[in-house]
């Protein structure tokens, strides 16, 4: 057991202190729920988003991330069944429309560390003005960390503790919070992730040097309509945590007829991101739209000599009808 503790105290903190603790995404512009829980249900649709990301292709042990997210808005209109004292069934209107729900799971490999995470989100939406919406979101999160023992060497790999405790890993719970403001012309938000900075518990002890650092995100964008069917959207995202240097993404996205998106983003610290996205609207279908996205992240640092860049694929499916979606919010 002591060897297990030593491995976690040396390998795990080193991995987490100098690499990203949270999954990194390039196409968050099209699914802000990944960085802000308040976004859940803000556009009135029910949407599914899938992402596959391969970071630093060609570099051994580089991060590889897969994620699946779901978000929805509770119907404004509808009815619920209520039993009266005479056991009669009565349909009464639901007093909803301001509540959003979301869920998010991911699997991430980063060097020797493999982790699986989940998030369950509750959001509340209210109108500040006729066309400006304020959203608040709170999420319960959990992360399961495990060391890939196949990439480690031991004198006696058949020891019992190696096959049980080490393979089982550790579970770290936490919470996220977010604020999001949405208007037809602009949007901005702030989120704080891993609020409690939870520490891993190995055996009967909690090790504070292996803890989840609090992360802060601030995002903003503005919508410019230059001609019928042609739009530009400049955006900026600031990220900061206790272990990593502040980082910013500064980008511009071209939108054509709400069917084609093409973007270019500069990431401080040495990164250039290009992305493209298409929307397909099938005839006589139950879903509203199907979205395909692809992004390439070119690293401008020394690591570019041994990699083929970072590649990210996304697939999104949106459901909605006139009773649950807000058409002026349908920007993506």
Give the residues covered by each predicted segment.
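Short, Lys/Arg-enriched, disordered terminal segments
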Residues: 1-5, 332
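Sec-dependent N-terminal signal peptides
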Residues: 4-14
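Sec/Tat signal peptide C-region and signal peptidase I cleavage site
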Residues: 15-19
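Subset of outer-membrane beta-barrel
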Residues: 20-332
